[in-house]
Amino acid sequence: VVAECENPALLFSGGKDSVVLLALARKAFQLGDRPVHLPFPLVHIDTGHNYPEVIQFRDEQVAKLNARLVVGHVEDSIAKGTVVLRKETDSRNAAQAVTLLETIAENGFDALMGGARRDEEKARAKERIFSFRDEFGQWDPKAQRPELWSLYNAKLHKGENMRVFPISNWTELDIWQYITRENLELPPIYYSHKREVVRRKGLLVPVTPLTPKLPNEVSEVLDVRFRTVGDISCTCPVASTASTP
């Protein structure tokens, strides 16, 4: 990607998959004992609904690497009118796609490396490792390039871009085993911690300004951990006392 693309970047949210991807990138550009210098920036699309611990972890990792961080804010897209939500507490997961395209256009990125995996959902299962997008940022399954062994075609016309998923064929078990083997640091909410929650529709819902306790609910402080670090509005923890992967 770095050899063939003019302006690549790596998507880094602070989640476990992007942590693994960043670790692989660091290994790829490690020269002896010298500090790693990544020849591309890190990109994060901030929905404004992230857990504070994850944003803090993201910033700490960027500072340790002395890397450049480009942040696209969904709030900016809302202010411009390119994203319209019914109410403030609506999930912003889908809205991220608009902000991502705007961030790509504003910075002229022609390739974005991401930590998506085929086993996560059906839509991702169909994507190639090098996933071609047209000048409108659209993915057309009929327009994808053949991928023979380790041979990939990264050629693009002006305005087109590539999404690259180096760990596409990894499973979630692979991710956790790699994190354990390499002793990779993760946001603390991946491990057991005390958190105020309410029991709602079979879920443990964190009590936050975005997800407040309802009048008929009773909150409790439990030992919990998160399996994923998505938005506050759509990510709930599970009861756990586990302090390791």
Question: Where are the regions a protein language model picked out?
Answer:
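Nucleotide-activated chemistry modules centered on ATP-dependent adenylation/adenylyltransferase
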Residues: 1-11, 16-245
